[in-house]
Amino acid sequence: MRTEEAAAVLGISGSNASHLLASLQKAGSVLRVTPGRWSVSGQPSPYLVASWLTDPYPSYVSLYTALSRRGLITQIPRTIYVVSLGRTKTVATPVGTYSVHRLPPELFGGFEERDGERMATAEKAVFDTLYLARARGQRFSHLPEIELPADFRPAVLDDWATKIGDRRVRSFARARIADFLAQTRRSSTS
């Protein structure tokens, strides 16, 4: 809940609501997740919190976190990776540490929403990671060993690459996709 929502429900000023929520936090009744955002029902889902951190810009969980949740990698990242239309940043909260990365609007999408949580599809998590390898240098330059599920649709990667406006960036992304698919095919036949 937002501080303003608490103020409206209680019929008090935002300042009084903030003081009341801070007192309730000291008593252990609520958790301050981010400035102006509170959880009244215990520890919120870390994937739900992701959208709070980028508000008013939309976001979804992707990259290594989505790869892990979708079963493509066995490693479980400590950091929760998020893509957004907002700026790139790292945010530490009581729920976890978030690494937010900006995508251009034409590449925003390819996620499923359930109970307010937005999670990239397997294909989009792979695409986002390959795409951001160009912009983020070393951070995403090496993908861990990936096990593609039987229902993985490689053509979706190229569909997303087609949406990249800059010809050089599109060419780089397609080359990364081709290398990735060739490498995973070699790994699966070994």
Residues covered by each model-derived region:
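Short beta-edge/loop segments at beta->alpha junctions of small alpha/beta modules
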Residues: M1-P58, P94
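Nucleic-acid-binding surface
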Residues: V40-S190
